[in-house]
């Protein structure tokens, strides 16, 4: 799996996505199917902002796909918090299907959105389990990898994530311009190591790779 360097045209087509992500034909077909379902369901429930639906291929699909480059070489269980329209959870499920990797668990408390996630999972035959529940109501999942996109600032995100982590867990977290402040705020209450990578879709954004997370005083 590979991605190219940062470029930001306003609107991408499915071919732009294919060219920059280097996905095989079958994987591209899964993304096309997902996009069709997203457009259909978005007319009834708010999965993405209407003005962003035409930006699916860069703003959502490629932005999610870039996380694959930061995953551990081997993982068995990946948990995505607040999965919404499936970014990045469904994308990671498609990647796992392609690569024969582990199981993906999506947690989404809004039942209509969870129904959408289940529909895409079923129709694409993805290795995904959808939990239609609040995060704190889900039994500990012991994730090897945990992701969340546009979900919560780091201090609160760590609170939600901790019950589902192991000492060896890795968190892969897309963040925007507030990343520096969020890291500083989180260090007031948490010990952790963090690596930061530039986003390939947004020059002001980054991908955080967090390890060895533990609460101070614990």
Feature map (PLM): residue ranges:
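Class I SAM-dependent transferase core
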Residues: 1-75, 79, 111-126
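Conserved SAM/SAH cofactor-binding pocket of Class I
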Residues: 65-148, 158
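Short glycine-rich anion-binding loops that position phosphate/pyrophosphate groups of nucleotides
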Residues: 84, 150-153, 177
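Conserved beta-strand segments of alpha/beta enzyme cores
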Residues: 103, 127-129, 170, 191-195
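Conserved beta-strand signature within the Rossmann-like core of class I S-adenosyl-L-methionine
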Residues: 168-178
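Active-site capping/gating segments
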Residues: 178-218
